[in-house]
């Protein structure tokens, strides 16, 4: 089972840069997309439902902003747009505030060869624009944690694909020394991810296959300066899975031969009958 995760930085822009044509060559079973930056009315039939796929989306209320989507060859048994009432916790940010930004889409596939499977497209907020958005990001992380705990305990196999906007370790970004006080590499953000892996029980699938890879692991490059040309990148896009599902991962790669956005596609193949 081949799963691709990609922050499109705008589905219309990425389509103009050839992403739909590229996807046809990939024959992926599931494609998780983030930062759609469009509403349904803005999208062509090819964007909504590429040939051979079912398309599902969770749009942001604000036009041209955020939004996530999933293409799947198999029709999902259930589609969950947003976190709704599944989130607990006592953070100041309301669930409605989070869901209005179109950041969570879950497709459930039941009675598969691995049991009941959920694939989620996730777009965690960035806090790089200022203190207000960083506060929102921390609040979303606090709100999201009980849901992540519940998913692990649900008995389903789960793969969460997306832009987490956090580089976990020093090997996950080029300039780690200069970014220790910057959003995306703050100690609190990194500790939160560590907790997901070490305490909650999630597995960083790429890292399970490539535990020491550095320069080749990056998935995002700033548009400023010559970040792409000099490979001054960050690994902030992940496929995070329940342990049994992660154990089925066979290969993981990052596609950089073409550029469809400021992110690169993360491609993972799972052993799946």
Would you name each region that the model predicts?
Residues 83-84, 204-213, 252-256:
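Acidic carboxylate-rich catalytic motifs and surrounding loops in phosphoryl-/glycosyl-chemistry enzymes
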Residues 1-50, 54-68, 196:
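N-terminal, active-site-proximal structural segment of metallo-dependent hydrolase catalytic domains
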Residues 63-79, 224-247:
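Conserved beta strand-loop-helix elements of the APE1-like EEP
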Residues 84-96, 124-141, 177-182:
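Surface-exposed cleft-lining segments at the edges of enzyme active sites
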Residues 6-7, 23-41, 119, 147-170, ...:
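Active-site beta-strand/loop signature of hydrolases that rely on acidic residues for catalysis
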Residues 27, 51-54, 140-232, 236:
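Metal-dependent phosphoesterases centered on the DNase I-like endonuclease/exonuclease/phosphatase
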Residues 36-37, 45-125:
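Structured beta-strand-rich core segments of catalytic domains in phosphoester-bond hydrolases
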Residues 1-9, 115-128, 161:
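Active-site-proximal beta-strand elements of phosphoester/diester hydrolases
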